[in-house]
Amino acid sequence: MTIGLVGRKVGMTRIFTEDGVSIPVTVIEVEANRVTQVKSVETDGYNAIQVTTGAKKASRVTKPEAGHFAKAGVEAGRGLWEFRLNNGETFTVGSELKVDLLADVKMVDVTGTSKGKGFAGTVKRHNFRTQDMTHGNSLSHRAPGSIGQNQTPGRVFKGKKMAGHMGAERVTTQNLELVRVDAERNLLLIKGAVPGATNGNVIVKPAVKA
């Protein structure tokens, strides 16, 4: 199964097993994912479904978005996401995907947008070691050091780890244990931390490496 669910990261807490072991979990709230479009090989070149979730103020919905949602006959949501379909999987526009979709899943992959850290140096961004605090070093404690050679090759190689913008990028954490599916409250409890800030959108899919 390649499809998943779009949810909202609520925060972290812990639950206890029957023998008293504490398990740290991230709580993901999954409101019903409404299917807004079904794509096919004939019309789009590939099979997929497009979903939305949550709600959006009417004043914040653009005219193209309003027309798209009206055509599907669903309430405007806070965004649009897409999941590829395997051969044989069928969905209809307007149908809803809920947490029970993952009821039989043990391990999941969670995708989100990592917390933005702004401009960061190499020590924070790439885990470089710091240089000596003493022994004649007075200015280069957190400097990256050499970034290459001299006239040959006369340039800095692509991919060189340097200071720059850190965070605020799409990140996937794989093989997290899905501890509990609370269908009554539309919650997923996932062991450990997941990418992103509180209230951020996350995509939960069955693990590809499980």
Swiss-Prot record:
GO terms for molecular function: rRNA binding; structural constituent of ribosome. One of its GO terms (biological process) is translation. This is Large ribosomal subunit protein uL3. Methylated by PrmB. One of its GO terms (cellular component) is cytosolic large ribosomal subunit. The lineage of its organism: Bacteria, Pseudomonadati, Pseudomonadota, Gammaproteobacteria, Aeromonadales. Coiled coil: none annotated. NCBIfam families: L3_bact. Residues 134-153 are annotated as: Disordered. One of the primary rRNA binding proteins, it binds directly near the 3'-end of the 23S rRNA, where it nucleates assembly of the 50S subunit. The gene is rplC.
